[in-house]
Amino acid sequence: MKRTLAIGDIHGGFRALKQVLERANVTENDKLIFLGDYVDGWSESSEIIQFLIRLSEKQECIFIKGNHDAWTEDWLSFRNASDVWLFNGGQSTVDSYSDYSQEDLEIHLEFFERMKNYHVGEENRLFIHAGYSSMHGPEKEVYFSNYRWDRTLWETAVAMDKKLSKNSELYPKRLLLYKEIFIGHTPTLHLGIKEPINKANVWNLDTGAAFTGALTIMDVDTKEFWQSDPLPALYPNEKGRNNIM
């Protein structure tokens, strides 16, 4: 049976990615939707991109672009590394590309350029890295950076009264547009939780792989999920992005 599986923020943790694909028994029949932030953090960002390029050649994959991916795309395009990016995990990505040829760098750049801002799948499910602010949906978003940086969508879902009916005038209009919304970007660790969180119709799959958490993959139909080992256990001699926690 073909499954649709969503994967949270990876942040250079290639070992974690391999673990969750194995633990979920992923086959070439499964559709994989990656929610972005493949890079910046642990030491294997370029290895992840190379793996994903090859993976997409043999099975259906959808790659959403995260804010860290946009930073890396800019660096691959212009070789201009901002201090903010380097501090937030970019240095590990730069280091991982140290032995790449210009031809291979261009292949990876093309991969970043092909990433999607968002994807609407079967049964009206939205997959987006961060969120959107327009009550008319992401296609009407004025500030495209919100696809990768917004936190208000998640904060709205978290703060909502659970008793609020969808028929209420107070129910957030932008949440009514989709059956379900799958996001990453804001680690569930911020709420002291190491597993995916569901608030209203929003599912947050960023379980803190950049920091002390694990990487998560979820079957979007059944909501069954699998996690890697905590990333510090997989990279015991590295800090990931824990320098900014």
Language-model regions, residue ranges each:
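His/acidic metal-ligating clusters that form di-metal
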Residues: 104-128, 133, 138-190
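Conserved beta-sheet core of the metallophosphoesterase superfamily
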Residues: 168-229
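Active-site neighborhood of divalent metal-dependent phosphoester bond hydrolases
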Residues: 41-123, 148-159
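Residue-level marker for buried hydrophobic side chains located in beta-strands
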Residues: 6, 32-34, 63-64, 126, ...
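Divalent metal-coordination and catalytic microenvironments
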Residues: 9, 37, 66-67, 93, ...
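Active-site environment of divalent metal-dependent phosphoester hydrolases
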Residues: 11-16, 40-43, 69-73, 134-135, ...
